[in-house]
Amino acid sequence: MAWNSQKKRTVKKSITKGLFEYIKETNPDKVFKCFLCLPSTKATDVKEALRQGVIDKNTKIVAIEHNYQYLRKLKIALTKLGFKHQSRVVICDDLCNITSQRLLRACNQLGVDSIDLCYIDTCSCLIRNLQRWIENIVANVCSEDAIVTTNVVAARATWDLQKYKTKGNYIISNENRNKWAAPIAHCLRECTNKITGFVVGYKEEGVNPPMVLCVNGFSVSIDEVLAIAIRKTRSYQNLGYA
């Protein structure tokens, strides 16, 4: 996939802000202990999670980056945010090549027994290989109450989503203009065995493809709290669409 690197990703910035607002609203007073992410060179997701109090300086970071050339800048960005070498493990590999055993070793190195927050921010499609990876990580590495966030391409390789096209009862997913939002939400609910709450379809200006972001799981199921989070989420629907 070819991201347009000459343009600022203003829509993604709004989506990232809304994502961590939602996680904060549905997990009040909780600071996550171990954050699995794909922060790239700017670590925007780590910065926003820290700003909103979803994580703090005691949180352990497991960062994944497949491009060896980006590692130096990634580590510098994490260090500037307060996550030095003793607070992080950086894994350089393709996402689906990383086994649960490798992630458990990273947890052990950091002094935690599991991962309780994931942001699988990919530029990939939700093909079966990625589905299996998510299933494996949730089953073997994540804590029982973990929050799993996934950001995937919504309109390229869709053959492995065909069986999920039956309409499901997903919060706000019917308001997404991208027709693959509901199947993706359905698929991720099955992969994670967690309710899909936050579902947003968006698209950056330029050549970038449409994306769908989903959050699975939350600690609070109180109707009033969810209603507030849903109202906030509505404001992020269809960003970047005409």
List where the protein language model places each region.
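SAM cofactor-binding core of SAM-dependent methyltransferases
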Residues: 3-103
